[in-house]
Amino acid sequence: MAKQNLELKATSFTLSVLHINHNDLDIIAAELDNKLAQAPQFFLGAPLVLNLSAIQHTHIDFNALKQLLIDRNLIIVGITDASAEQIEQAKSMAIAVVKSGKQARKAELPERATKIVKQNVRSGQQIYAQNADLIIFGAVGNGAEVIADGSIHIYGALRGKAMAGAAGDNQSVIIANSLEAELVSIAGQYWLTEHLQQYDLSQRGCVRLEGASLTVESLPQ
C-alpha cells in the first residue's frame, strides 16, 4: 500500500487558559508581565486559549491583544466563552473557537478512568493521564511534571509541577503527602512556590478550586 503523504487524525493537547477579566489592554499588559516574571520559562512560547466569559458584553481590540501576547512570546490558538461579536472577530483573524470544559460536559461523559504510576517521577519526566485521574505511588521530584484531565493523588512528596483538571474540570483536586511544589494548577488556575509557602507544606494536603481561586486544605496523615 502506498504511503499517504497527508493524514488527518484526532488527538488532544494540554493548553493553558488565560482568563481575560478586563478590556483595558494596559491593565492586561501589567498583570501579564507580573505573572510572566514569576515563571518566565514555564510560559515561554506557550499556546493559549483566551476565556472571555468576563468580558462578553464589552469590546476588546483583538489585533492589539494578539500583538500584546506575541510581544511576550505567547501565542493565541483559540478563544472560549465568547460573544457572537467576539467569535466573528476571532474567526476573521484565523483564531479558533473552542468549547470550554463546562460546555463540553453538557454531553454525557463516560466514567473517568484512572492511571496508576508505581514509581517516583524524576526530574525531566512528564506523566499525562488523558481523560483520567492520576494516582502516583511515589514522589514527584523537582523538575518533573504530572498532568491529568481529572484529579491527581500522590502518595509521596510533590516537589515538581502538578496540573489537574487539564481539560477544564474545575472539580478536580491535587492531593499529596507534602506540597513543596514548584507549581500546582487546577483547570488553568495556578500557584507557584511562593503562594504555597503560607501553608504547612510538610503536612498532607489537598489543593482545590473555590470559585476562581485555589485553596489548600490540610488532611490527616
UniProtKB/Swiss-Prot annotation:
Can you list the disulfide-bonded cysteine pairs?
Answer: none
Record function comment? Cell division inhibitor that blocks the formation of polar Z ring septums. Rapidly oscillates between the poles of the cell to destabilize FtsZ filaments that have formed before they mature into polar Z rings. Prevents FtsZ polymerization.
* GO term, biological process aspect, one: cell morphogenesis
- Kindly list the organism's lineage: Bacteria, Pseudomonadati, Pseudomonadota, Gammaproteobacteria, Alteromonadales
Q: Which keywords, in A-to-Z order, does the entry hold?
A: Cell cycle, Cell division, Septation
Family membership noted in the UniProt record: Belongs to the MinC family.
Q: Name one Pfam family in it.
A: MinC_C
- This chain's source organism reads Shewanella frigidimarina (strain NCIMB 400)
Query: Per the record's keyword annotation, is Amino-acid biosynthesis included, yes or no?
Result: no
Record bears the keyword Acetylation:
no
- InterPro entries cross-referenced by the UniProt entry: CAP/MinC_C (IPR016098), MinC (IPR013033), MinC_C_sf (IPR036145), MinC_N (IPR007874), Septum_form_inhib_MinC_C (IPR005526)
What the entry lists under PANTHER family is as follows: SEPTUM SITE-DETERMINING PROTEIN MINC
In Swiss-Prot or TrEMBL terms, this protein is called Probable septum site-determining protein MinC
Its quaternary organisation is:
Interacts with MinD and FtsZ.
